[in-house]
Amino acid sequence: MAYRKPSDLDGFIQQMPKADMRVKVQLAEDLVTFLSDDTNSIVCTDMGFLIDGLMPWLTGSHFKIAQKSLEAFSELIKRLGSDFNAYTATVLPHVIDRLGDSRDTVREKAQLLLRDLMEHRVLPPQALIDKLATSCFKHKNAKVREEFLQTIVNALHEYGTQQLSVRVYIPPVCALLGDPTVNVREAAIQTLVEIYKHVGDRLRPDLRRMDDVPASKLAMLEQKFDQVKQEGLLLPSALKNTNGNGVGLDEADNIGLRERPTRMIKRPLHSAVSSSLRPKPNVNDVTGDAGAVTMESFESSFEVVPQLNIFHAKDMDDIYKQVLVIISDKNADWEKRVDALKKIRALLILSYHTQPQFVAVQLKELSLSFVDILKEELRSQVIREACITIAYMSKTLRNKLDAFCWSILEHLINLIQNSAKVIASASTIALKYIIKYTHAPKLLKIYTDTLNQSKSKDIRSTLCELMVLLFEEWQTKALERNATVLRDTLKKSIGDADCDARRHSRYAYWAFRRHFPELADQIYGTLDIAAQRALEREREGGGGGGTGTGTGTAPETRRTVSRIGRTPGTLQKPTPSMRSISAVDTAAAQRAKVRAQYTLYSRQRKPLGPNNSNQASMTGAAASGSLPRPRLNSNSGGTPATTPGSVTPRPRGRAGVSQSQPGSRSTSPSTKLRDQYGGIGNYYRGATGAIPKKASGIPRSTASSRETSPTRSGGGLMKRSMYSTGAGSRRTPERNNPVRPSAAARLLAQSREAEHTLGVGDDGQPDYVSGDYMRSGGMRMGRKLMGRDESDDIDSEASSVCSERSFDSSYTRGNKSNYSLSGSHTRLDWSTQRAPFDDIETIIQFCASTHWSERKDGLISLTQYLADGKELTQQQLKCVLDMFRKMFMDTHTKVYSLFLDTVTELILVHANELHEWLFILLTRLFNKLGTDLLNSMHSKIWKTLQVVHEYFPTQLQLKELFRIISDSTQTPTTKTRIAILRFLTDLANTYCKSSDFPSDQSQACERTVLKLAQLAADQKSMELRSQARSCLVALYNLNTPQMTLLLADLPKVYQDSARSCIHSHMRRQSQSCNSGANSPSSSPLSSSSPKPLQSPSVGPFASLQSHHHQLSISSTSPRSRQSSVEQELLFSSELDIQHNIQKTSEEIRHCFGGQYQTALAPNGFNGHLQYHDQGQQDSCASLSSNSKTQSSANTTQSNTPESATMRLDNLERERTTQNAKSPTDDAKVITVSINMAENGELILASNLMESEVVRVALTLTKDQPVELLQTSLTNLGICIKGGNCELPNKHFRSIMRMLLNILEAEHTDVVIAGLHVLSKIMRSNKMRHNWMHFLELILLKIIQCYQHSKEALRDIDSMIPRIAPSLPLDLSINIVNPVIATGEFPTNLCAIKILLEVTEHHGSEITDAHLDIVFPNLARSADDTQSMVRKAAVFCIVKLYFVLGEEKVKPKLSVLNPSKVRLLNVYIEKQRNCISGGGSSTKNSSAASSS
């Protein structure tokens, strides 16, 4: 087709619609040439026609034509100037799309067009960037995002910060640091660097305040900023506006700063920099969306309605019918429909909804019409008016609108994604009104289903935002039915692909947590580490828009604001690489360091405690492994902190091997000292200053070895080399398992600091129970110096403990022992040096790191954290377990070795909470044993499995082992099978009782026995075959009847094979028995696995142990079945036991020397409820003076709640139980025989010393037998009431920890016994100076126990009047007042009763200020839904009335309703008559306290 070049614009406009591509290309070139020539006139018929003709070129698929169209627009902008502004709204969106073109030339022309718009004043730079930002920051095309960042940089360079405010763009730019595209991330970094050049150091704090900036990115940006500053690239605007940030610059710096011309710069080439971390962007809209409606516009429109002429109720019906017809007619004029929707609001304003048929009939009719509008209406004004009407209906009708909302909700949600902003925003606000006012549980299903299934990110993001409002506005009761669905939905949305949805979901999580803390913990435990950190940041930052507030139920441990960095990469760094051993004389360097440290230490050392005089190798408060130590700062007297520039020689001797050389001790422990953060030694520094590593696996001679052996270390007593706490102590498996119910968490939220204080120790005093008894209340007891009480030669330099090789086999689990340092004869207090990190969240971050050195530091710190007696919260524990699942197959040997230490420590602390994790633990350890390992690693895994044996219930272990063996989906290796069978054999032989064997004949048992029989006939591996046969025999020995039944169900072939194995073993055993000592057996195979008697054999009553009353040992000791000889010894002593019972009971009953009498009140409650029980019991408690040594004989005990050699048998149990069950018997006079020793100690019945009572009490936990707990607590109460309280004061914190644990028990009698002891403590003036520091914790714990049971409630009711005289007024009011205000029944009732009794006993001290504090809450309680709370509040107000007088209280009564005031007047009059009649004013108060 012939082409003729046009001569004017009208000619170009006429030819533009032509379809010939060649013509278009030529026409486009000619048009650009025409427009670029200033001599050519641009006058035409209509410039709009030219713009309309260029638009298809711009949006077409031909890149050359699109490029020419951009050039043509640029030329038009130059010619028209500001007149082009009329066309920017049409052109700009398509220019944005061309920014993402695949051709570089097209993108460049688009950039030039944007520059021309700013340069020729078509749009101011700020206005143009704002318009672009609304869509470019979140544009789906990565090229658009990248080019827009370049546009910001160009504009900034061209116009500077005077015309362009960049602060508003920083958050969305930071969000792009986590963009999936590498080029966008690089462009974002470059953009921030360019912004820094203009604004200077003001940018740094803004970036640090943004939690969504990954720490690695922040560190990179800081480095680039520093580089820019050092190179003098900062512009004058940055230096002028620093406002003091640049004060550090000297003249030379200023000279180096040069002005740079503000000109357009070429875009730098992108280099592929990978980013491994994806942030959670917190992108806020830069500007408001044009056309969007707001909540204010809704509110102002609610009552903008037409006036209705209503004269009769029928008129309203007529109007309603007209409205219904109009809004249902799709063909009606849209203005009429808008007016009809307004009339609906007008009818509601006139209370039309009060008519009975409105909700039942007319709302249903309206819902159908509204569904049609929301589904099919195209007019935005109609939909907007419908949304306003829906919002007003929800605000007016509230829950009556539930059926209506259920009908329209799904369609209303679908409008969120509408491209028209007015529709999307109106529907969103209508949804907010529905959530705020219509609390209908049936609506939640639609919310959650849509959120889970919607593919629109706008819908998901908005619904996540609405979830925050949902959890803030709705009551817990309305959410309970759908709690699990909400949990699953919230969990999914936290991991949503859209950043805004994730952000709102994190806010919603903390709001959800206030309703369901347990379910929130479940969500937290399933998240990965990054998501958990993001959650914590939202909580710390307070969230956005008031939605991210934290709650009292969240984890206590918070990261500090000033902490450096956020991830392991930016936290504490390890020291530089060590010098070679050949570089310096390492021995001299180390000895010099030791001398310097000791010199510093000797200036600060404290005298030894009274109980540590024998422990010469320990100093100060560190004499016992579990005692509190002064936390010395490394900069204030302790070991000086190592500077980054310092280096420390690193000896290259094999770990754990003493390599003495002629004339040298360079590898003795004194040369193993390390820097503060010098690697693995940080963990063990608290013990020895040396580095006790695992064995290297290199064969070594033991002929001249100084390695510890069981016959030398610990006084010749057997102990576990790795996890034992020393020859004189035994870490027991029973421990305080803190229960954290939501109610308790809410009640005790204010007292966590007090509970934390309890974990510090007894004011630095040595605790004589430390190292001998188990930890209680979260404080670890059970670390003492190895063998200090047994042997004095352990301090000698030649002793086994001092040798380096002994570390591998004798270091304690907590590593709190101090060893002699060879060559110097000095000892340092290594407790001043800590693990790399103390903050648990930092530790968890490091453990989750991908770098092995950071994981190592994290594991070291976590091990030390647990070893210090601290416990993890439920959230932290779940997070740690999730990380550990990945660490089980860690390929780095050093990290895995530390990991096993940490796992062991975790088991020791949290065994009771790891039952569900046991299957994973065993499976992973067995799989690891199936790989090729060093001998040292192999033995270490088995040591961990030994701890599993001892700290998990044997029945649970059997169940999980059967599950592992019978799992047909797994095909373990031969080595793995051998490890499993060996573990099972050891368990059955050593730890199980016959009752532990599953008795339900489950399929798992049958498959397990079948599998064992198959493996016992395996022909490939002799070792596997032998181990399988041993396992069969062990199980048969464990429970012969059950195994016989299981074997009978096997196929004939395997049945014969298994029986042959068992019979052959029986024959061997019978032969060995015939050749040895003949002893009767209790089962055919009782001698096949000899199990030594594990119960202690010390103390005067050790042999008087009935098989029914083995409270301290037999119920949990690691014996499966004792031989008949042992059983006969026990049975033969039954007569002696009964004789002793009767004799001791008679002595207690008839002995009157040194007695004190306690009369029980008629109701049986005066704080000594159990005396009449325990007075008839033989408290056979005997801890011999050398019990430390004797208890060490049982270091291999397992599953025992007590390791102390203690006997507390409850005699005449039936009588005790009967008495305990009837505490309201008639008044009885109880006599308890006590005497006083020369040293001031009490001597109770059966010569039980007060020190023994306290010692035993400190070992109590809530899971021990009820009779034992009652006996021990009763004895402790006697000592507190009748003694001088010297010992209870000395160990007050340990006693408090024990009592707090006891009060968590499930058994009511145990809780009551604990409350009695607590009552005596609070009534003891001698202990007042101690318990006053923990008053808040004590009162809140009492209030918490009030909801335990009816018996506990009655006991507390009788306890409150007795402790009230001792309570301080101000502090007590401050504690109970918040509980009265916010507590739930019955905790608020208990708080009111405490306030009533305090008012009764401290009436003269009450002031107007006190009345102002408590009266508003009492007034609200007077209208409580619970009648008992109302009654107690009324009695309390009456008491205040008489204490403070009518003139002060009566004005306050105005807040009460008239009926309540009349009721108060009745009670006041009755009280006044009672007082005038000579009655006591306490009667009514007592009635209130018992109501």
Swiss-Prot record:
SUPFAM superfamilies: ARM repeat. One of its GO terms (molecular function) is microtubule binding. Residues 1070-1097, 1111-1124, 1181-1200 have a biased composition (Low complexity). The modification Phosphothreonine is found at T648. Keywords: Cell cycle, Cell division, Cell projection, Cytoplasm, Cytoskeleton, Developmental protein, Differentiation, Microtubule, Mitosis, Nucleus, Oogenesis, Phosphoprotein, Repeat. It holds the Pfam family XMAP215_CLASP_TOG. HEAT repeats lie at residues 44-82, 85-123, 163-201, 402-440, 874-912, 955-993, 1289-1327, 1408-1446. GO terms for biological process: attachment of mitotic spindle microtubules to kinetochore; axon guidance; cystoblast division; establishment of mitotic spindle localization; hemocyte migration; mitotic cell cycle; mitotic sister chromatid segregation; mitotic spindle assembly. Expressed in testis and ovary. The modification Phosphoserine is found at S582, S626, S634, S806, S817, S820, S822, S824, S1120, S1123, S1124. Its main location: cytoplasm. It is found in: Cytoplasm, Cytoskeleton; Nucleus; Cytoplasm, Cytoskeleton, Microtubule organizing center, Centrosome; Cytoplasm, Cytoskeleton, Spindle. Residues 537-586, 600-739, 1065-1127, 1167-1205 are annotated as: Disordered. Residues 542-551 have a biased composition (Gly residues). Residues 569-580, 632-646, 657-671, 699-712 have a biased composition (Polar residues). GO terms for cellular component: basal cortex; centrosome; chromosome, centromeric region; cleavage furrow; contractile ring; cytoplasm; cytoplasmic microtubule; fusome. Interacts with CLIP-190 and microtubules. Microtubule plus-end tracking protein that promotes the stabilization of dynamic microtubules. Required for several aspects of mitotic spindle formation including the formation of the overlapping central spindle microtubules and kinetochore attachment. Required for the incorporation of tubulin subunits at the plus ends of kinetochore microtubules during poleward microtubule flux. Acts antagonistically to Klp10A and Klp67A to maintain metaphase spindle length. Also required for guidance of CNS axons downstream of Abl. Belongs to the CLASP family. This is CLIP-associating protein. It comes from Drosophila melanogaster. The lineage of its organism: Eukaryota, Metazoa, Ecdysozoa, Arthropoda, Hexapoda.
